[in-house]
Curated annotation (Swiss-Prot):
Pfam families: Aminotran_1_2
Cofactor(s) listed: pyridoxal 5'-phosphate
InterPro entries, sorted: Aminotrans_II_pyridoxalP_BS (IPR001917), Aminotransferase_I/II_large (IPR004839), AON_synthase_class-II (IPR050087), AONS_Archaea/Proteobacteria (IPR004723), AONS_Proteobacteria (IPR022834), PyrdxlP-dep_Trfase (IPR015424), PyrdxlP-dep_Trfase_major (IPR015421), PyrdxlP-dep_Trfase_small (IPR015422)
Protein name: 8-amino-7-oxononanoate synthase
Class of this enzyme: transferase
Gene: bioF
Purpose of the protein: Catalyzes the decarboxylative condensation of pimeloyl-[acyl-carrier protein] and L-alanine to produce 8-amino-7-oxononanoate (AON), [acyl-carrier protein], and carbon dioxide.
Amino acid sequence: MNAGALSRMLSEGLAARRAEGLYRSPRVLKSVDGACGLTADGRTVVVFCANDYLGLASDPRPGRVMARVAEEQGAGSGAAHLVSGHRPEHEALERALADWTGREAALLFSTGYMANLGVIDALVGRGDTVFEDRLNHASLLDGARLSGARLRRYRHGDVDHLARRLAEDGGRHRLIVTDGVFSMDGDRAPVAELARLARDHGAWLMVDDAHGLGVLGEKGGGLLEQSGLDQDDVPVLVGTLGKAVGSFGAFVAGRRLLIDHLVQSARTWIYTTAPSPAQTAATVEAVRLARHETWRREHLRALVRRFRAGIADLGLDLMPSETPIQPIVVGEADQALQASRALEERGYLVTAIRPPTVPKGTARLRVTLSAAHTPQQVDGLVAALGQVLGQ
């Protein structure tokens, strides 16, 4: 393919996306302080579409730790973990994460996407089968596809459908993979039933608790803490540090044997530069705050109840979510975009989520709540939604 043909193909694809209302572009916010952001044209908006569930992303304490360590050590690690990039800060964070989640050990990855690709590829391959919920995050589906294992998807949250698929399958090794909290719907996976199925069928269970860690459980240990499941019930736990923890990166936690295996086999960990020591040190502090400042979870839960009650009073439909993810399905992509723009005109930033992220005809306003929000800000959003979507 020559350069001209490539340009034509790209132009046609982009034009089709624009025509369907599916063209994407990053939105620039000059700054975000707590729940408020400053747009490129200088307007202040209340942000209701971030994943900063505990309001830690703008807390000054992790920032001060980062500044101190950056002053001492510079901005980067300089190498991969297995070369010369592994520092005491990485060790400290891995110990803190293992302790928080009740696992023997943890391994730090640069992103959640890399963690999911790396761990699935390290555990299964040709001759094996991966079973995934149809609404799993793209990184989980991509991990299964890239591993070479057979991918079999089951209906969302349907353990009976999964049981039938397990009974029909003759794979050498079988891995059940699920989100803990589903990122676009906000509902929780039936992890206790999945753990039982895994035991009954000799399969392994992997849970990506990106949106549950820090939010669910008495100590913020996530959906597995809330459900009382240990590392034998769920051998592979993935968590992210860029959502409730308010920092950056991800991790895999489980028995020491699992972590030792990943150090040998997880290509997305082996062949990449280790995270910045300064960022990592800041994350250690953020994890401490997420664990011990329980008022953040209590305030967040109160805001979720307040928002749902307000939306119910308006007669609008919400999905059955008790987490900070509160989606309002609008329908077509252009309708969701129009609603998002109308909310921004009223001072509220809520991103429209469109296909292919969600199925066609289910474009939505994905409202996310944070401990940084005030009750008054939540009430203001509810009133604005009533004006924009009022029936």
